[in-house]
């Protein structure tokens, strides 16, 4: 685990960034930035020893930040409808580029991208590799993501070369292990008796657990290079989301209904090839079914409401 470093985390209030920040804060000087519209939301981060700053990345003003961070984790992301594409590009592409310029002395910078970068493949079980075509995907729950993902990757690649700045671009698959993740939304939908909607049946994913992300982070940062290094950040197992729902149905004693709702241009599956990542980090340490059961036991008692179910692809768009 990384220790004794000065680390900046953008979008620190995000569901991936929060546990990473808290884990890193135990042995490092961690700074976290976000908009922090409600000042009270800063309290748990400050209590954990994280220095916070209210910064809107889209504004491009980083005068309130030092420039001597040893590591940068760029996890900030704005989800937006297609009519907000200009705002999304400022927040997801232009602003981060200016931040990288400000933090160009960092030893390593991790830039989070995602599966939305890939052009769809007709086989839902296709394992997307880092060399696959990019740029033509459509995501119904975040239509500005494909353009933004391509944009931030291009800016990161430019900054790596222009500033001699070691960068690793991590294409994140489905995140698992906390109550607001897509697998958790599937559990809530099953418990609420909702139909599980997806672009295809089957709709396989390669989820990665937060515990694996925490211990793999040091190796991922060590892979940062000039030119930028691109790698899928995914789990080692691939499983359809319909199977997650069936497990939740089995444990709850509920029947589960499914519906396939194809979206023009959208991928039928979200499977990542973990080969390159495994060469860097070694194999994952968690087993999906075991961790999904733990998540079920955590989520089930509080399943009276479903938050943001459309994002979890469990309600028809």
What is each stretch, according to the model?
Residues 171, 175-177, 197-204, 229-239, ...:
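Glycine-rich Rossmann NAD(P)(H)-binding loop
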